[in-house]
């Protein structure tokens, strides 16, 4: 245990293996896949499949690096614990708070999406009203106990998975039975101007948006402290990520782009709506809206869980106020859930004041925070592995391609930042990174000063 972990109580280990597996899976199927893929298809054409394969490989390397650390030391606060222990107290402080802010931003974005999806049925309801209602409901559920969160996420994820699998099967049937019409042919993947119609540039420029789709995979690391059997469930969930990326992202996009020429995809429609259009309008439109609504709620649900656990871990390390390191008699960190909720509620206000511009900026900020997050996992892992080697410890679940894999990941992160600088509307979030790091530095110095003052008394 780290120093500063004596106070506060323990989180309950209430998550079963099936919960962990589906939390990992659900984290990867969100708004990014359902809606974000349209603009990528317009720019990269069928090359989007290659883009998801590359980003998926990087995500898998990062997951394995996190997995190796978590199996050795399953604690609350996930990788901020490793950054803190193996890299230094500022790294722990910065990575923990960055992760917390990342998921507050994702929570804001998903709540905004929920408001938009509800308007599909009830256009007269303003987005902030639906956002506020679901905000209250999901926070209330998370305040009960971790088993309820696990169950809810389990069923949310099942709905999303069934929808994607049904789409792949139905699309495959249309393709191979001839019922998809004359335009449905596998040759659509290379006939319309080639596999990479706009060359590699078209694909490379979209890597930041593709990366947004993979944010959330690292949720598995956060669940470790509440998993019944982390040394079995974490490696299993981590290794299955690769099949899931292949099936859900690459499989669904390959079917989708074979069914009709990619040139017919429009940026403002979910490509998944287009494919199911064949079934008849109203049924499909409603069914799909339920699925995308579930996807957004599921990711928001995970955000509430994640934020509260990260803040709890920070408080245990002494990097957040002590009051946040307590749990109630059911093992729920009530204070951290309420603090995270309070900050997220602020974004309901932002959406109320500036509904148009808020969403795009939130997305770009999410990718920037995600880049910092993944880079820190990779760097902390290198420090962790070095420390273990010096102690002569052989880890039970070693990461792939160490240390080359870590350098590949870091190069990829740097490339994503360069791409964002060249993308209109995204550059601002890259310029905000140094500002954010300065804010973290000031926060850290304030914390150190306060700690010294307390010790002096």
Swiss-Prot record:
Where does the UniProt annotation locate this protein?
Cell inner membrane
Intrachain S-S bonds: none
Q: Which domain of life is it from?
A: Bacteria
Tell me what induces its expression. Answer: Contains three promoters, P1, P2 and P3. Repressed by the regulatory protein TyrR, which binds to TyrR boxes. In the absence of TyrR, the RNA polymerase (RNAP) has a higher affinity for P1 than for P2 and P3 and occupies the P1 promoter region. When TyrR and its cofactors are present, TyrR inhibits the binding of RNA polymerase to the P1 promoter by recruiting RNA polymerase to the P3 promoter. P1 is not repressed by TyrR alone but is repressed in the presence of phenylalanine, tyrosine or tryptophan.
User: How's its activity regulated?
Assistant: Strong, mutual inhibition of uptake by tyrosine, phenylalanine, and tryptophan. Transport is also inhibited by the aromatic analogs p-fluorophenylalanine, beta-2-thienylalanine and 5-methyltryptophan.
Segments in the Cytoplasmic topological domain: 1-18, 64-98, 146-147, 214-239, 301-330, 381-402, 448-457
Q: Does the keyword Isomerase apply?
A: no
One biological process term from GO is:
tryptophan transport
Q: Where would one find the signal peptide in this protein?
A: none
Q: How does it sit in the membrane?
A: Multi-pass membrane protein
Q: What Pfam families does the record point to?
A: AA_permease (PF00324)
Q: What does this protein do?
A: Permease that is involved in the active transport across the cytoplasmic membrane of all three aromatic amino acids, phenylalanine, tyrosine and tryptophan.
Entry's NCBIfam families? PRK10238.1
Q: Which PANTHER family would you find in this protein's record? A: AROMATIC AMINO ACID TRANSPORT PROTEIN AROP (PTHR43495:SF4), GABA PERMEASE (PTHR43495)
The record's similarity note reads:
Belongs to the amino acid-polyamine-organocation (APC) superfamily. Amino acid transporter (AAT) (TC 2.A.3.1) family.
Name it. Answer: Aromatic amino acid transport protein AroP
């Amino acid at each position: 245990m780290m120093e500063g972990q004596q106070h506060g109580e323990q989180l309950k280990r209430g998550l079963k293996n099936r919960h962990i597996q589906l939390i990992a899976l659900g984290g990867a199927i969100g708004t990014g896949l359902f809606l974000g893929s349209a603009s990528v298809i317009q720019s990269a054409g069928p090359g989007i499949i290659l883009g998801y394969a590359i980003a998926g490989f990087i995500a898998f390397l990062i997951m394995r690096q996190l997995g190796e650390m978590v199996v050795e030391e399953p604690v609350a606060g996930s990788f901020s614990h490793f950054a803190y222990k193996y890299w230094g107290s500022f790294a722990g402080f910065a990575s923990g708070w960055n992760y917390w802010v990342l998921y507050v931003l994702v929570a804001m974005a998903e709540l905004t999406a929920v408001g938009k999806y509800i308007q599909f049925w009830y256009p007269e309801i303003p987005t902030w009203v639906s956002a506020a209602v679901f905000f209250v409901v999901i926070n209330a559920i998370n305040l009960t106990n971790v088993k309820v969160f696990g169950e809810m996420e389990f069923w949310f994820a099942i709905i999303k998975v069934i929808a994607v699998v049904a789409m792949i099967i139905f699309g495959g049937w249309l393709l191979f039975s001839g019922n998809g019409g004359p335009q449905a042919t596998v040759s659509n993947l290379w006939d319309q101007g080639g596999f990479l119609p706009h060359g590699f540039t078209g694909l490379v420029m979209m890597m930041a948006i593709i990366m947004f789709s993979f944010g959330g995979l690292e949720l598995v690391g956060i669940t470790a402290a509440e998993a019944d059997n982390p040394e079995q469930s974490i490696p299993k969930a981590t290794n299955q990520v690769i099949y899931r990326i292949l099936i859900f992202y690459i499989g669904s996009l390959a079917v989708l782009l074979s069914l009709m020429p990619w040139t017919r995809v429009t940026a403002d429609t979910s490509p998944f709506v287009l494919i199911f259009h064949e079934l008849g309008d109203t049924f499909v439109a409603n069914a799909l809206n339920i699925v995308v609504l579930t996807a957004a709620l599921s990711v928001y649900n995970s955000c509430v869980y994640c934020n509260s656990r990260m803040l709890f871990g920070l408080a245990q390390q002494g990097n957040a106020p002590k009051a946040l390191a307590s749990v109630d008699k059911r093992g729920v960190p009530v204070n951290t859930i309420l603090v995270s909720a309070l900050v997220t509620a602020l974004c309901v206000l932002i959406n109320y004041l500036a509904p148009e511009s808020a969403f795009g900026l939130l997305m770009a900020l999410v990718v920037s925070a995600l880049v910092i997050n993944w880079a820190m996992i990779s760097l902390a892992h290198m420090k962790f592995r070095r420390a273990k080697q010096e102690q002569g410890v052989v880890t039970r679940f070693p990461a792939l391609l160490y240390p080359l894999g870590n350098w590949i990941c870091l190069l990829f992160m740097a490339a994503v930042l360069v791409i964002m600088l060249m993308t209109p509307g995204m550059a601002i979030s890259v310029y905000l990174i140094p500002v954010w790091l300065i804010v973290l530095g000031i926060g850290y110095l304030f914390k150190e000063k306060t700690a010294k003052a307390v010790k002096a008394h």
